[in-house]
């Protein structure tokens, strides 16, 4: 008899698959922010990932430098013993030619850079999600220096 009096709409409120929200609690989708509009979740994730990436980059970077130096020293040693011949002028021309092409100040036909399309994209990249980016890059620097 009570089920008839309560009605279907009233019982629907107590259905077990309906999400329960308290008046003073935030939903899971709500971002946690302070009065300064800082997203603490993004800051935490950015700093954690940045620290790990910086530490790994520092360790792997040193390993990469040591490996490249060992390969270069081995090639130079084998070349000095006469087992292989390296045409250094041709190699230098092949490496430096493309480098000068990309690092030289070759302006487009208009005589200046296209800054109108460059600066808005840089500004948009910096301004979107700054909490994550600032914490990521600062923690990456700390991880890189401490490795």
Swiss-Prot record:
The chain crosses the membrane at residues 63-79. GO terms for cellular component: mitochondrial outer membrane; mitochondrion. Coiled coil: none annotated. It is found in: Membrane. Keywords: Membrane, Transmembrane, Transmembrane helix. It holds the Pfam family FUN14. This is Uncharacterized protein C29A4.17c. It comes from Schizosaccharomyces pombe (strain 972 / ATCC 24843).
């Amino acid at each position: 008899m009570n089920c008839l009096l309560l009605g279907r709409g009233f019982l629907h409120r107590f259905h077990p698959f309906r999400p329960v929200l308290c008046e003073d609690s935030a939903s899971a989708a709500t971002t946690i922010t302070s009065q300064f509009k800082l997203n603490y979740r993004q800051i935490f994730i950015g700093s954690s990932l940045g620290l790990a990436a910086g530490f790994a980059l520092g360790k792997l970077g040193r390993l990469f430098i040591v490996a490249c130096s060992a390969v270069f020293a081995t090639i130079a040693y084998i070349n000095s013993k006469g087992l292989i011949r390296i045409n250094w002028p041709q190699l230098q021309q092949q490496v430096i030619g493309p480098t000068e092409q990309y690092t030289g100040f070759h302006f487009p036909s208009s005589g200046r850079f296209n800054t109108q399309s460059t600066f808005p994209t840089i500004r948009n990249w910096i301004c979107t999600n700054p909490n994550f980016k600032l914490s990521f890059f600062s923690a990456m620097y700390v991880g890189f220096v401490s490795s």
